[in-house]
Swiss-Prot record:
Pfam families: G3P_acyltransf. Belongs to the PlsY family. The lineage of its organism: Bacteria, Bacillati, Bacillota, Bacilli, Bacillales. It comes from Bacillus cereus (strain ATCC 14579 / DSM 31 / CCUG 7414 / JCM 2152 / NBRC 15305 / NCIMB 9373 / NCTC 2599 / NRRL B-3711). Keywords: Cell membrane, Lipid biosynthesis, Lipid metabolism, Membrane, Phospholipid biosynthesis, Phospholipid metabolism, Transferase, Transmembrane, Transmembrane helix. This is Glycerol-3-phosphate acyltransferase 1. It catalyses: an acyl phosphate + sn-glycerol 3-phosphate = a 1-acyl-sn-glycero-3-phosphate + phosphate. The gene is plsY1.
Amino acid sequence: MINSMQFLYLVASYLIGNILTAYIVTKLRHNVDIRDEGSGNPGARNMGRVYGKGYFIATFLGDAIKGAIVVAVAKYLFEDPTFVMLTLLAVIIGHIYPVLFKGKGGKGISTFIGGLIAFDYLIALTLLGIFIVFYLIFKGFTKPGLITIACLPICMILYSYSIVTTILSGIIIVLILYVNRE
């Protein structure tokens, strides 16, 4: 059962997810809305396509740090891995479906990566190894990245997390795969 402090933290996590790095950077640097540029997605990939590698890196880091901070603070305050995974889900949902932007956010991958590193860096390193193998096979980022993300629940089991925490990780994966389906 979630107590009132945890509930408030989940709401805050969702709202923090609403902070879209790509939107902020393009508004500050170019006074434009990235959602009107390129693919229209306020994420690192679109920023890289429209403005170059530096903007990709800045957006990736901003969104990843957002996920990492939410998860790291949750680990410190609450310690329960299941609740911490729930906060990762909340910040990702906030990034993908931000109420502040009428539900039109990014695809959640950068936020997921940052949050996962803060959740359990060993799982993140394991997934990095899996990604490298698939990257060498497919010679691209998208397909290996999505395959790697889909391996998270297996890693959760291998690293002895509870079934509930593993199911939450699976929900995160289904959500990310759904918004990245095209």
